[in-house]
Amino acid sequence: MSEKPFPIPDDVPTESPSAVHDRLVSDERFGVLDTRAPADVDDWRIDGDGVAFANVPYYEFLDGVPEDALAELPDARPLYTVCAKGLSSKYVADVLGDAGVDDVVAVEDGMEGWETVLEATELSADTDAAVVQFHRPSSGCLSYLIVDGDEALVVDPLHAFADEYVDAAAERGADLVAAVDTHVHADHVSGVRTLARDHGVRAVVPAAAAERGVDYAVDYDTVADGGTLTVGETVVEAVHTPGHTSGMTSYLVDDAVLLTGDGLFVESVARPDLEGGADGAPDAARRLYDTLHERILPLPDDTLVAPGHASDAAERADDGSFTDRLGYLAESMPALDRDREAFVEFVLDDMPPRPDNYEAIIATNLGDRRVDDEGVAELERGPNNCAATTDAMTEG
């Protein structure tokens, strides 16, 4: 349902999405009143352990504040109102304030503003290089900046934040020299081409992913299994880890940090159906099993796994990042202890809906489809569902 015309007050207290995110990360308790239609809220909302959440559509407030709506309001304060663009939420905040509800604050720009939040956390890792994890809370997407001396490389950059990676490298006294993807993404538009086009950064695509027919308007290099990229004095090794996609490639930094893309998460394993569909999923799941047991799990237990996504079920490490030691994941994730066919059955039985617009996003990332910034935002709106399950597979 589109938002109907109503007065938009200009004196309602507001707070930036970044400030709301900071409160969320601190586990401070607060309330969220989402004024979008229920169908828009079910799969994509601001949520967390400290959030008391309610959904009452804005149109319920067009004639004042109904008693049943008051009864549904979270008791936690502040109470943030949020909508799609920051319009109806201001109206509702104003109406609630007039009705005597205290400490109501509208989230600036609504969920569109929430999409612009990017959180940076430097990993506590046994590497000479600094490895910085970037987290987009609106989708759970994770990207990484590797900085050694005056050079930096970014892995799995998002188009929407291309300039931020360049700035982050500069803040650390480095030039961003290369951008590389782990695979052809299905949930967000890659920033590799954007960085090459706008900032002269070297574009790199996994050789196995390029075989799907990557057709960029900019020149790009490929890196094959066992090949290396260098950042300053740091060596980054490409490790072909198919399963989620045929071209899925992880990157081992200083033999200590494994950037697993969408192959292995800290709370789950990858879904296998986004490239070959339902018909190809069983064979892809078998490839994923082989990858996990032949290419990833044999690495040292203290290898730090740094994935490409974090779901709501993911827990933060002590340094605030979404990472974990490989040995812990091997012990705590029952899926990794199953035999091959039991693993395949388990993965195929528990998959969430495919990401919104995933076919159009794949086409865009292959270079078959062109979209502007507004089109990118529309394609990416909503949750990612690249994991095999929305629930944690880990125990403990």
Tell where the protein language model's regions lie, with residue ranges.
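Conserved beta-strand hairpin/beta-sheet module of binuclear metal-dependent hydrolase folds
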Residues: 37, 123-171, 251-261, 266-267
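Active-site HxH/HxHxD metal-binding segment of metal-dependent hydrolases
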Residues: 60, 116, 159-234
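Ser/Thr-glycine-rich phosphate-binding loops at phosphate-binding pockets of nucleotides
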Residues: 89, 180-183, 241, 245, ...
